[in-house]
UniProtKB/Swiss-Prot annotation:
This is Threonine--tRNA ligase. It catalyses: tRNA(Thr) + L-threonine + ATP = L-threonyl-tRNA(Thr) + AMP + diphosphate + H(+). Catalyzes the attachment of threonine to tRNA(Thr) in a two-step reaction: L-threonine is first activated by ATP to form Thr-AMP and then transferred to the acceptor end of tRNA(Thr). Also edits incorrectly charged L-seryl-tRNA(Thr). PANTHER family: THREONINE--TRNA LIGASE, CHLOROPLASTIC_MITOCHONDRIAL 2 (PTHR11451:SF44), THREONINE-TRNA LIGASE (PTHR11451).
């Protein structure tokens, strides 16, 4: 009688199979729909091909395109299909590496000449032939020296180097599809025919192993999906991302710009700085209502402060240093050490806690020039930064309040988010009981508010557990924005204490928190999320008044003055241009309201209202328009153009 294996599925059910059955065969017995969708699997948590055999009792998870790891396998096979096509068209090409990415993939090639757009079209056509052929993809484990001989005989020098880098205790494996063989740990799809929809996107330069001293390679990017519709949707989002790019919209809308004289530092223009101040002042009011004390601490600080905090030893490479009068200083990369100094400046009682210190001052960190990316990755920035000094028994309550503040800000802006709870790492510092209670307090706060969250075991900082809030924008991209970080170590390093009810000194817990995070980055995200169609309340220019002819300038000036006096950000366009031209320009600048004034409007004390993204609202008494605008500003509502942009839908 043949042996059997017991396989536990994710739902807890246990199935019995003959020993040695392939995963593909086992999945077929579970159901035809799952068998058709299956891409790869995890056996006892290890990624494997569907051709792998079940030799002992185990857990089994079938991966489909709905799973992140399933998509990675799908796109990893896509890189091999692309590499096979390149080798067919360019036999002299040398293969290096080709990993999957979140929504795409790439492969680096050593080629004698640059690839052209026409070359990409030919590669795509050849890939289609490989998919049509539906070659089985076969895994083979080989001897290390045999693998080196195999690739050396074919002139694949980079692959020989890669074999040498495989640890001695790891298996060397190759994958073959048709005439093509590549060194790869896998897993892969069962056959090339599974990749039905793909597109090559671009070619860029890349260096072998990322070292500029090495030869430059050609990196071909592509993407792939299970269906043509999913591919089309992704390509639409990709084009939308280009159209919404804040690095283009910022200068076009007169918000900000970057100059070579200050790489990584934004030059804020008048309109952009208005938007910046609106967000900052809104945040300030929300924090004042919750008992925060706003401070301003020095921008340049002695290295001695950072020696105490530990940043000089562990973060110095990311700081801008200054040497003056035989002393070392640095521009401030974060506010927490200075806030510790303020806390320690006087004796604190348990009644003084929680003490909430907020600051919006300038910060700077050194980032390599190659990593800078508009407002999203800068060297100079500001944060809606705050530090809460609390008793251990106050942690849960204060975390709830911070999450409530996140809700208020993100909810108003129409941003959805996911929460990650990162717990104690192996190299944690401090008392394990305090860690356990802090992690439990974070979890209780989330559970008590009915929040779902993802647990990241061991991913916390060494000095405390944390919550990360990942925002999803209109194009489905995720951005880590808000952070709530517990810190047990800085209070120790700065010897921070408070006098408890028992009259003895106790150590406070420090909570680092930022809601928007870096304001520069947050504005970059919002610019792309709204495609420049900012809600009325934060729009740099809320209305533009357009006189039809010169004789209407006086009335237009009266309208501008009255609206500005009422607190609206309004400007007039008095240029000697046709009104249609001025309307079109105001629309391109995404101004929420366009107010046209002529004889009828001047006589009636009215304005002809055009709303962004909508048809004309028609003539309206000026007082009625003002009431409409003020109501929308007070409620922080979004107009149709703003809502549509934030939804990411096609026109």
């Amino acid at each position: 009688m043949s042996s059997v294996v017991h396989v536990t599925l994710p739902d807890g059910s246990v199935r019995e199979y003959p020993q040695g059955i392939t995963i593909a065969e086992a999945v077929a017995q579970i159901g035809p729909r799952l068998a058709k969708a299956a891409l790869a699997a995890k056996v006892d948590g290890r990624l494997v091909d569907l051709s792998a055999r079940l030799e002992k009792d185990c857990t089994l998870q079938v991966l489909t395109f709905k799973d992140e790891e399933g998509r990675e396998v799908f796109r990893h096979t896509s890189t091999h299909i692309m590499a096979q096509a390149v080798k067919r068209l360019f036999p002299e090409a040398k293969l290096t590496v080709g990993p999957p990415l979140e929504n795409s993939f790439y492969y680096d090639f050593d080629l004698p000449r640059p690839l052209t757009p026409e070359d990409l079209e030919k590669i795509e056509a050849e890939m289609a032939k490989i998919v049509e052929a539906d070659y089985p993809i076969v895994r083979q484990e080989v001897d290390r020296e045999e693998a080196k001989r195999f690739f050396a005989e074919r002139g694949e020098d980079y692959k020989v180097l890669l074999v040498d880098k495989i640890p001695e205790d790891e298996v060397v494996s190759i994958y073959t599809q048709g005439e093509f063989t590549d060194l790869c740990v896998g897993p892969h799809l069962p056959s090339t025919g599974r990749v039905k929809a793909f597109k090559l996107l671009s070619v860029a330069g890349a260096y072998w192993e990322g070292n500029q001293a090495n030869k430059q390679l050609q990196r071909v990017y592509g993407t792939s999906f299970e269906s043509k519709k999913d591919l089309e949707d992704y390509l639409f989002r990709l084009e939308e991302a280009r159209r919404r790019d804040h690095r283009r919209l910022g200068p076009e809308l007169g918000l900000y710009r970057f100059e070579e004289v200050a790489p990584g530092f934004a030059f804020w223009l008048d309109k952009g700085y208005r938007l910046y101040r609106e967000l900052e002042n809104w945040s300030r009011k929300l924090q004042e209502a919750r008992g925060y004390e706003e401070v301003s601490t020095p921008w340049i600080v002695s290295s001695k402060l950072y020696e105490t905090s530990g940043h000089w030893q562990h973060y110095r490479q990311n700081m801008f240093e200054i040497r003056a009068e035989d002393q070392d200083f640095a521009t401030k990369p974060m506010n927490c050490p200075c806030h510790c100094v303020l806390y320690k400046s006087q004796i604190r009682s348990y009644r003084d806690l929680p003490l909430k210190i907020a600051e919006y001052g300038p910060l700077s960190r050194f980032e390599a020039s190659g990593t800078l990316h508009g407002l999203l990755r800068v060297r100079g920035f500001h944060q809606d930064d705050a530090h809460l000094f609390v008793r251990p028994d106050q942690i849960e309550e204060q975390i709830r309040e911070v999450i409530g503040l996140v809700d208020t800000i993100y909810g108003t802006l129409g941003l959805e988010y996911e929460i990650k709870l990162s717990t104690r790492p192996e190299d944690f510092m401090g008392d394990i009981e305090l860690w356990n209670e802090a992690e439990a307090a974070l979890a209780r706060a989330l559970d008590g508010m009915g929040r779902s969250y993802k647990l990241n075991p061991g991913d916390g900082a060494f000095y405390g557990p944390k919550l990360d809030f990942d925002v999803t924008d209109a194009l489905g991209r995720k951005w880590q924005c808000a952070t709530v970080q517990l810190d047990f170590q800085l209070p120790i390093k700065f010897d921070l204490t408070y006098i408890g009810e028992d009259g003895k000194e106790h150590r406070p817990v420090m909570i680092h928190r930022a809601i928007m995070g870096t304001l520069e980055r947050f504005i970059g995200i919002l610019t792309e999320h709204y495609a420049g169609n900012f809600p009325l309340w934060m729009a740099p220019v809320q209305a533009r008044v357009l006189p039809i002819t010169d004789r209407h300038h006086a009335y237009a000036g009266e309208v501008v003055a009255k609206l500005q006096e009422a607190g609206l950000r309004v400007e007039g366009d008095y240029r000697n241009e046709k009104v249609g031209y001025k309307i079109r320009e105001a629309e391109l600048l995404k101004i929420p309201f366009i107010l046209v004034v002529g004889d009828k409007e001047a006589e009636a004390g009215a304005v002809a209202v055009r709303r962004r993204g909508m048809k004309d609202l028609g003539p309206m008494p000026l007082a009625d328009f003002l009431a409409l605008a003020q109501s929308e500003i007070a409620s922080k509502a979004m107009d149709e153009a703003c809502r549509k942009a934030a939804s990411g839908t096609r026109d």
